[in-house]
């Protein structure tokens, strides 16, 4: 049997496990829901082992490994923390942060839920289970991930017609395919182990070094180009896959257009580290990571959510990035990067630190402006609009190589688009 088919079968098994648990168990069946995490984790573990030993294409390994690991995180959120059920058609627990603990699950709701659960058909329950298993942003619902980009920035309530939606996304797929195919042969992959060597990851500590280990202007240019190129390719690949799935799902009447809001925000939103991660970059893993971080912050560490304390917000944010770091670390392992060499955890935790630094600087500037009692001049406004993107590029240029150089070292020029 084709190895890729076996890998996809493992992913389908994980999706089916989530669908069965969410669709056919009530919120009180917590033991059964917890037991469901065992086959999820078992599948992800064997997926990683299988990919490392049987799948040679690094692109396939990256996609399949990331999908399998993320389905474990999604299961923990949907089945255990948020406890989605068919009977309520919604999450029934606030442990994952989706709903206030006193706004749902009243006795009346539970009685109605029991009746609905008893009379529902097998296919309806299974369909609902798969709907949740395949969701990660919940657009057009009360539980949508914060700050999802609208279809039209000037008119956030606008939803395109089906024909316009299909035309736009089909065009995007074709453009991305052509761009990725055209850029796949650029550069010499034989140079990658040297150009992206681990000793070239440090930046500021090498600025004053005049010896062979020092950094040159040429290397800085290569570093900036590699980092920007990496994130541009990530953007293109993710948007391509998302648009392709959207075209298939809407064409076959599996879902409505309103469920496929853009996966990325506007590039103009990327004016700093916080806006890059919170508003521009895709939010596909946000709910799963936030759910686990919410539980740890407010139910294990016992921070008060209603206090609005800076410490609670920053602990929560750091944990969100840390969970994302775990996810990306295991995804790296599926690509053949040894666990100890993956820089994913360090990179993602650094993003939280970058946001804290950004917040602190903005607070100082705001306080100075208030104390001076003067508005922003034209020059200050121009500098303000430029400083955000410059700061973001500088931050990513410093922090990204610690993570992405590990995979770039191993890049042997295998095209992302194999045809």
Swiss-Prot record:
Function: Terpene cyclase-glycosyl transferase fusion protein; part of the gene cluster that mediates the biosynthesis of the enfumafungin-type antibiotic, fuscoatroside. Within the pathway, fsoF catalyzes the acetylation of C2-alpha-OH following the C2 hydroxylation by the cytochrome monooxygenase fsoD. The fuscoatroside biosynthesis is initiated by the cyclization of 2,3(S)-oxidosqualene through FsoA's terpene cyclase (TC) domain, leading to the formation of the fernane skeleton isomotiol, harboring a fernane triterpene skeleton with a C8-C9 double bond.
Naturally occurring in which organism (per UniProt): Humicola fuscoatra
EC number, UniProt record: 2.3.1.-
Glycosylation sites: 2, 112, 169
InterPro entries with a match to the protein in the record: Wax_synthase, Wax_synthase_dom
Key words, A-Z: Acyltransferase, Glycoprotein, Membrane, Transferase, Transmembrane, Transmembrane helix
UniProt record, GO biological process: lipid metabolic process
Top-level taxonomic group: Eukaryota
Annotated protein name in UniProt: Acetyltransferase fsoF
């Amino acid at each position: 049997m084709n190895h890729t088919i076996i890998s996809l079968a493992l992913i389908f098994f994980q999706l089916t496990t989530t669908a069965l648990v969410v669709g056919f168990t009530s919120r009180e069946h917590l033991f059964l829901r917890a037991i469901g995490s065992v086959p999820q984790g078992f599948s992800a573990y064997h997926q990683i082992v299988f990919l490392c030993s049987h799948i040679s294409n690094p692109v396939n390994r990256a996609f399949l490994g990331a999908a399998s690991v993320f389905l474990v995180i999604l299961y923990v959120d949907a089945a255990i923390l948020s406890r989605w059920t068919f009977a309520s058609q919604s999450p029934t627990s606030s442990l994952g942060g989706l709903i206030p603990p006193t706004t749902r699950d009243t006795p009346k709701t539970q009685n109605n839920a029991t009746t609905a659960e008893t009379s529902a058909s097998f296919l309806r329950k299974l369909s609902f289970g798969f709907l949740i298993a395949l969701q990660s942003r919940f657009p057009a619902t009360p539980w949508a991930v914060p700050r999802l980009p609208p279809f039209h920035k000037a008119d956030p309530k606008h939803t395109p017609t089906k024909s316009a939606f299909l035309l736009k996304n089909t065009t995007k797929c074709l453009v991305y395919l052509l761009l990725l195919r055209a850029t796949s042969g650029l550069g010499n992959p034989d140079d990658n182990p040297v150009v992206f060597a681990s000793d070239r990851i440090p930046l500021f500590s090498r600025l004053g070094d005049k010896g062979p280990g020092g950094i040159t202007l040429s290397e800085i240019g290569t570093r900036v180009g590699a980092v920007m190129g990496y994130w541009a390719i990530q953007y293109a690949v993710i948007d391509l896959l998302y648009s392709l799935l959207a075209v298939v799902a809407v064409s076959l009447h599996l879902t409505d257009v309103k469920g496929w809001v853009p996966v990325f925000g506007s590039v103009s939103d990327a004016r700093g580290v916080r806006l890059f991660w919170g508003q521009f970059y895709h939010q596909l893993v946000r709910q799963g990571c936030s759910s686990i971080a919410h539980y740890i912050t407010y139910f294990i560490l016992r921070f008060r959510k209603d206090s609005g304390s800076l410490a609670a917000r920053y602990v929560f944010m750091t944990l969100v990035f840390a969970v994302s770091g775990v996810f990306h670390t295991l995804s790296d392992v599926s690509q053949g990067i040894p666990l100890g060499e993956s820089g994913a955890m360090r990179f993602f935790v650094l993003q939280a630190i970058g946001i804290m630094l950004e917040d602190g600087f903005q607070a100082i500037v705001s306080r100075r402006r208030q104390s001076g009692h003067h508005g922003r001049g034209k020059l200050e406004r121009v500098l303000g609009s430029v400083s955000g993107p410059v700061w973001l590029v500088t931050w990513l240029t410093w922090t990204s190589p610690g993570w992405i150089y590990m995979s770039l070292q191993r890049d042997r020029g295998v095209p992302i688009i194999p045809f």
